[in-house]
A protein has these predicted regions:
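Bacterial N-terminal signal peptides
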Residues: 12-25
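N-terminal secretory signal peptides that target proteins for export/translocation
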Residues: 1-11
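Alpha/propeptide regions of enzymes that mature by internal proteolysis
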Residues: 29-406
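Sequence-pattern detector for short linear motifs
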Residues: 6-8, 17, 274
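Short linear sequence motifs
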Residues: 9, 13, 45-48
Length: 406
């Protein structure tokens, strides 16, 4: 079945947060495995009273709070073995090849694939939708983006395109060798992209799109998003982040060492399942793709600096950037456009270097919260060869956070 739809410091009084967490209704310990889960009612971080950093989120607390940014997702969940999908991010709704955006890529640990990244960093431009999927589908996705790009009105004579495609390996839950992501899945995700600024649905999180088959810290991972809006005195800009989480480490939420008390293997034993056959349960390996959007007027050099800060959000949740972890951050500005028809020069706005620090902080905080959201919203998934990844249990997590933040 294909389902398509289309985020550290803890603030506030600790005592208030502890009381708030304890008064929320408890939910089931784990979500039953499902190939097509119903509407996701699992909480986001702020539903648990958690906040991250100084700045407030935008209205949707999503990457689509950055004006013009679009997100589309296609989830592939078919039979017992297919658990994968596509997530597409569009910097704007126009012709991206003819009206490119300033962009950059920061590579923290390059054990992975990010097709198109070398040209992005060479030219400082992004000219296609950004697509996330699974490891073996990046090549088919890149081909689909190229075909989609040259087919757009106004691109009839375009002889090239630079698809930007990232991945994580979902082969534990998904029959990755089956190459189930097809060209029409990619174009469907792009075409069905919706933005909160256009009145569309919020970005769906958890076990959806490119996060359908991913695992993080031994729990079910997925897609997460968050945003920050700077006050007018600091520019009034918005920073939005979207993540695809499939990595490990020692899970830490809002500074609380969750990994010490709440572990996937222990939860599996409560079901009579040893959990020992899950290599992700105690592994720091895996990958994380981070996409950072902003309406601040930044050039490619500044955007690479912004992307680098997003990696610090991974560190806050306990990532150690292990040998086998492919950790990439893509950043773009919706303000600085580069016209394909430009001749010798074109003017751009550029933010002063001293004004970057609030944006850096916003990117770190939004990345941290997006990762936490990806875990909280993820539902339990059973897939390839009956492998199973449990959603992190909300009642136990709530009690742990409450006791630690009291």
């Amino acid at each position: 079945m294909i389902r398509s739809k289309f985020f550290v410091s803890v603030t506030g009084a600790r005592l208030f947060l502890a009381v708030f967490l304890l008064t929320l209704p408890l939910t089931a310990q784990t979500t039953p495995p499902s190939t097509a889960p119903p509407a996701n009612t699992r909480p986001r971080a702020r539903d648990l009273g958690l906040t991250f950093g100084l700045y407030d989120p935008g209205p949707k607390n999503a990457i689509t709070d950055v004006p013009g940014v679009l997100v589309g997702q296609v989830t592939l969940s078919d039979g017992d073995n297919v658990r994968t999908g596509v997530t597409a991010i569009l910097p704007h709704a126009g012709n991206l090849f003819q009206d490119k955006v300033a962009g950059a890529v920061f590579v923290y640990n390059a054990y992975g694939k990010l097709i198109g990244s070398t040209q992005v960093n060479e030219l400082g431009q992004i000219e296609t939708p950004i697509v996330l999927t699974n490891t073996l589908s990046v090549f088919d996705a890149a081909s689909a983006i190229a075909h989609w790009t040259i087919a757009q009105p106004g691109n009839e004579n375009v002889p090239r395109a630079n698809p930007l495609v990232g991945e994580t390996n979902d082969g534990w839950l998904n029959d990755i060798r089956g190459f189930h992501v097809k060209a029409d899945n990619v174009t469907r995700a792009i075409n069905e992209a919706s933005s909160s600024s256009r009145g569309g649905d919020p970005v769906e999180e958890g076990s959806v799109g490119a996060g359908t088959g991913t695992i993080a810290f031994g729990w079910k991972g997925g897609i997460g998003t968050s945003s920050r809006h700077l006050p007018e005195k600091e520019g009034g800009f918005t920073v939005g982040v979207l993540v695809q989480t499939n990595f490990g480490g020692r899970l830490t939420i809002a500074g609380v060492p969750v990994w010490k008390e709440l572990r996937p293997k222990e939860e599996a034993s409560l079901r009579g399942d040893s959990g020992e056959d899950n290599p992700a349960a105690n592994s720091a390996d895996g990958s994380c793709m981070i996409v950072v959007a902003t309406d601040a007027p930044l050039d490619a050099r500044q955007l690479r600096r912004l992307a680098a800060r997003a990696i610090l959000g991974m560190a806050r949740v306990g990532s150690t950037a292990s040998n086998g972890s492919g950790d990439y951050a893509i950043a773009f500005s919706t303000t600085n456009r580069i016209a394909q028809t430009a001749t010798r020069s074109q003017p751009i706005a550029l933010l002063a270097e001293d004004a970057l620090s609030p944006l850096f902080e916003a990117a770190i905080d939004a990345t941290e919260e997006a990762i936490v959201n990806s875990l909280l919203k993820a539902t339990t998934v059973q897939g390839f060869q009956s492998h199973r990844a449990d959603a992190i249990p909300i009642p136990q997590l709530r009690r742990l956070l409450s006791n630690s933040l009291r």
